[in-house]
Amino acid sequence: MMTLPFVAKGQIGDHRNTLSIGVNGGYNLTTVRFTPKVVQNMKGGFAGGFTMRYTVEKYFSTIASVQGEVNFAQLGWKEDIRTIDNQPVINAITGVAEKYERTINYVQVPFMAHLAWGRENKGANFFVNAGPQFGFYLGEKTSSNFEFANRNTADRANSVAAQDTMSVQKKFDYGITAGLGMEYAIPRAGRFQVEARYYYGLGNIYGDSKKDYFGSSNFGTITIKIAYLFDIMH
């Protein structure tokens, strides 16, 4: 019976108390899942901000942490305006191929579980991040080379265009994010990371009731990022 406390202690893993902070930056590739469908290419945009991570435990070979970030992110969509023959749609007024894209800026706040395997404080480890993410709308900007009233509707294979004149209606975004990455730690120099992350939006940017035009309008975002962290408590 006297051995039970020692067995229990071994089962819960080795406690950690490491707090790391730093910065991150990268590039977003985003589409919006519109229903009815809007044909798009991925829209690029900046992503970057601040990272905080608290390492709580090492359980066997798994290093367990919680990680939070506050990031500025450019999302949106870029329309692929084509004919039924997959050719660019030429505007009758301007004589050039029609182009339209929308940039929507957010402050994004992910809260994630961070699980890593490998070297903890010197060398490389591989990690996964996963958890909820919340987005707070800052503003939006449209880039277009044609007037909406003068768009070439006759030649478009995809006739859905209501989104071109609609501002974002729902200013709070939320969803699930997950990523895979690698970290390299150098004592007294810091921790260097590279990560690929995916965000699936569960909220819509437009109303989605039966009376609304779009049934869905949620984000899907691939992010490639790098980060630098340093320990302030160990």
Regions found by a protein language model. Give the residues of each.
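Short glycine/proline- and aromatic-enriched beta-strand/turn motifs that initiate or cap beta-hairpins
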Residues: 9-53, 169, 231
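Predominantly the C-terminal beta-signal and adjacent terminal strand-loop region
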Residues: 12, 16, 173, 178-234
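Residues on the lipid-exposed face of transmembrane beta-strands in outer-membrane beta-barrel proteins
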Residues: 23-27, 48-54, 72, 109-117, ...
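Extracellular/periplasm-exposed beta-strand and loop segments of Gram-negative cell-envelope proteins
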Residues: 31-43, 75-105, 137-173, 204-221
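Transmembrane beta-barrel architecture of outer-membrane proteins
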Residues: 43-49, 63-65, 104-110, 125-127, ...
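Acidic/histidine-enriched, beta-strand-rich ligand/metal-binding domains
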Residues: 73, 77, 104-105, 116-127, ...
